[in-house]
Every structure is written in structure tokens, then in C-alpha cells.
């Protein structure tokens, strides 16, 4: 009997592709063959996959882009992708098919349904994306990166967590130094593109803190390129020691050394914060599809590990009060850190592997 084949189907964004890559790496180590089914955009994110993973570009499309003619052709392009996937599966039958969301996962999952192959999906956010919502009732397992996750009626989810980078795992459960009368670190993360609203509000909010906190505070603030100069100037005017960059290559280290994190609540940011275990103030991106960033934050907020401030309610005064509350109460901050850690899933990849192998065993 040959080696089992895992077919991974994922859309063309980093949010879909990173957990797919983590699973691919783990399954290759366990002796499986792995194929990745994605579109041309997704293939650009596939450079980090193990070199033994075969990448198949599929015909897919989205209704979100293009003019009327392009939208009219979407069903035909998807149908062509499904037919191609069915033919490919008949030639080389996957043991399990895993979808990570995005329109490019439609052909492989549709083919798996048609051929009654073992199949599962992984959703990174607290609200199912359009494609995962479509397939949730049609797969044997729905793995959730964020918990709780809003699921269709009758569908049960399994909280695996979101796989994170090795650099984050190396800092998992790093000892938390509570706020005190010594140098403290505050980290501001705006997601992959920075966040203008955090650049607008955070510097002024910090400047309003009591002097006994400001005297010890060191700030690392991720901002958009066009905002770096004005944010730096705002901190300088307030006499604050701040490092402002568009991207920090050592975010895991900075998180592990932080007394408090102010962040958007993208799925990967929430996973990093919970696995390292740090108190957080979360400001969900208001324009996120289906308000999924608010859903992402819900688990940490309900665990009393994070404070949620809707973007519409974010102002310097309110934010300053929340920052001061965390940094002036060391026992409460320590408990928030513990609660975050308890909510995390550092073994997310291993949990996904277990589900894949369980489905494969059921088939044999």
C-alpha cells in the first residue's frame, strides 16, 4: 500500500495559507504525500511549503472582483475547476481533503463531496467565511481556529486553535512580569497593514497616563508607512520613549516582554497573544467581513483575558483609563495573562493532524 495522500485546498491570502502550510509540514514529517490546491494568487504564498508538496493551480474565481462579465463567468470557471478536481482525484485518490477557506478551495471540496471522500475544513476566524459556511454541513469535521465560533445550526465544531509560527511557540507561556515600578513594555499591533485608528488614538491616550506609569513605559508601535512620521512626532512631543515601525521582525519577543498589548483582533494576532499569554486591549477592525474580528476577540474577552473596545467607542480618554487600569493593578494583570494562556492552543497543528488521521482511519 502506498503512502496516504492529503489534499489541502486553500485560498490566496496569508490567513488561509499559513495554517495550511503548518499542517502540510506536519503531515510530510509523518510520511504522508501532500498536494496543495490553490489559485495563482495563493501560489504566491506557497514558497514556504515543503519542497515535496506538489502545488496544483486550479481554475477558480470570486464574485467580489471584476465587472459584470467577469462575475457572470465565475460559475463557469468554478465548474471547470470542479471537473478538473474530480478527474485529478480519480487518477490519484486523496485519503483526506482539507479546506482552509477561500474561493480556490471550492473545486477540491466539491470534488470530495461528489466522490464521497473524507473531508474537513478549518476556519481561522470566529465567523465562518462564505466558502466554509457553504461546506460546513457537507464535511465530516469542522475545525475552529477561534473559540467560540458561530456555526450553522446542526453543525458541531472542534476547537483546534490556529497554528502559529515557530518563533511564537518558542515563547509560549513565557513568564509574565507584572507591571511595577521598573521599565515596562507596551506593544501596539495594527495587523499586517498597521491600523490608522490606533495611530490616531493610542499616542494621545498614552500621554494622558499618570506620571508614575509614564516614567517607566517603553512603547513599540506598528504603524502604516504613511503614519510613521506623525506617530513618532506625537510620542516625541509627549516625551515618551517609543519605537515606531511599519513592521517588527521580532514581534514574538516583544509580546513575551510586554506588560500589555493593544491590538486588532485578527485571528493570528489573537492566537499569538493567547499562546504567549499576555493581557490585551483589543480593537476589532470595524469593516471586517461579518464583523469577524469582534467574534475573534470574544473568547479572550469572555475568559477575562482581554478588554474589548469597539472602534466606534475608541477615544483617547477611554483608552487611557483602560491602559492605566491594567498597568496599575499587577495582580489583575497577572490573572489576565493566566486567563489568556489557558485559552490558547499551542498544539493547534497537532490537533489538526489528529483529525486528519482519524478521518483517514475511518475510511480504511
Curated annotation (Swiss-Prot):
Disulfide bonds: none
Superkingdom, taxonomy of origin: Bacteria
Reaction equations catalysed: di-trans,octa-cis-undecaprenyl diphospho-N-acetyl-alpha-D-muramoyl-L-alanyl-D-glutamyl-meso-2,6-diaminopimeloyl-D-alanyl-D-alanine + UDP-N-acetyl-alpha-D-glucosamine = di-trans,octa-cis-undecaprenyl diphospho-[N-acetyl-alpha-D-glucosaminyl-(1->4)]-N-acetyl-alpha-D-muramoyl-L-alanyl-D-glutamyl-meso-2,6-diaminopimeloyl-D-alanyl-D-alanine + UDP + H(+)
Pathway involvement of the protein, from the record: Cell wall biogenesis; peptidoglycan biosynthesis
Gene Ontology molecular functions: UDP-N-acetyl-D-glucosamine:N-acetylmuramoyl-L-alanyl-D-glutamyl-meso-2,6-diaminopimelyl-D-alanyl-D-alanine-diphosphoundecaprenol 4-beta-N-acetylglucosaminlytransferase activity; undecaprenyldiphospho-muramoylpentapeptide beta-N-acetylglucosaminyltransferase activity
Function: Cell wall formation. Catalyzes the transfer of a GlcNAc subunit on undecaprenyl-pyrophosphoryl-MurNAc-pentapeptide (lipid intermediate I) to form undecaprenyl-pyrophosphoryl-MurNAc-(pentapeptide)GlcNAc (lipid intermediate II).
Protein name as catalogued: UDP-N-acetylglucosamine--N-acetylmuramyl-(pentapeptide) pyrophosphoryl-undecaprenol N-acetylglucosamine transferase
Amino acid at each position: 500500500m502506498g503512502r496516504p495522500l492529503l489534499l489541502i485546498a486553500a485560498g490566496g491570502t496569508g490567513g488561509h495559507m499559513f495554517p495550511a502550510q503548518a499542517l502540510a509540514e506536519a503531515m510530510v514529517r509523518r510520511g504522508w504525500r501532500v498536494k496543495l490546491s490553490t489559485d495563482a494568487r495563493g501560489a504566491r504564498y506557497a514558497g514556504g511549503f515543503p519542497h515535496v508538496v506538489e502545488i496544483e493551480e486550479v481554475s477558480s474565481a470570486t464574485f467580489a472582483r471584476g465587472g459584470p462579465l467577469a462575475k457572470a463567468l465565475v460559475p463557469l470557471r468554478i465548474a471547470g475547476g470542479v471537473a478538473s478536481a474530480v478527474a485529478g482525484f480519480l487518477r490519484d485518490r486523496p485519503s483526506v481533503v482539507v479546506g482552509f477557506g477561500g474561493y480556490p478551495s471550492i473545486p477540491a471540496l466539491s470534488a470530495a463531496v461528489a466522490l464521497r471522500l473524507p473531508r474537513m475544513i478549518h476556519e481561522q476566524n470566529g465567523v465562518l467565511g462564505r466558502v466554509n459556511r457553504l461546506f460546513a454541513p457537507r464535511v465530516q469535521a469542522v475545525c475552529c481556529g477561534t473559540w467560540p465560533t458561530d456555526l450553522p445550526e446542526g453543525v458541531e465544531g472542534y476547537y483546534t486553535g490556529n497554528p502559529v509560527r515557530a518563533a511564537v511557540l518558542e515563547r509560549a507561556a513565557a513568564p509574565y512580569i507584572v507591571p511595577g515600578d521598573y521599565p515596562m513594555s507596551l506593544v501596539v499591533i495594527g495587523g499586517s497593514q498597521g491600523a490608522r485608528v490606533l495611530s490616531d488614538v493610542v499616542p494621545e491616550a498614552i500621554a494622558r497616563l499618570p506620571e508614575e506609569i509614564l516614567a517607566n513605559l517603553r512603547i513599540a508601535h506598528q504603524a502604516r508607512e504613511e503614519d510613521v512620521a506623525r506617530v513618532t512626532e506625537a510620542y516625541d512631543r509627549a516625551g515618551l520613549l517609543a519605537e515606531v515601525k511599519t513592521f517588527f521582525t521580532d514581534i514574538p519577543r516583544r509580546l513575551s516582554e510586554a506588560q500589555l498589548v493593544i491590538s486588532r483582533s485578527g485571528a493570528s494576532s489573537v492566537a499569538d497573544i493567547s499562546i504567549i499569554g499576555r493581557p490585551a486591549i483589543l480593537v476589532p477592525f470595524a469593516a471586517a467581513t461579518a464583523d469577524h474580528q469582534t467574534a475573534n476577540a470574544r473568547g479572550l474577552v469572555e475568559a477575562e483575558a482581554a478588554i474589548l473596545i469597539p472602534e466606534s467607542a475608541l477615544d483617547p480618554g477611554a483608552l487611557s483609563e483602560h491602559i492605566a487600569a491594567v498597568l496599575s493593578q499587577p495582580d489583575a494583570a497577572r490573572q489576565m495573562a493566566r486567563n489568556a494562556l489557558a485559552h490558547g492552543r499551542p498544539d493547534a497543528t497537532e490537533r489538526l493532524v489528529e483529525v486528519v488521521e482519524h478521518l483517514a482511519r475511518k475510511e480504511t
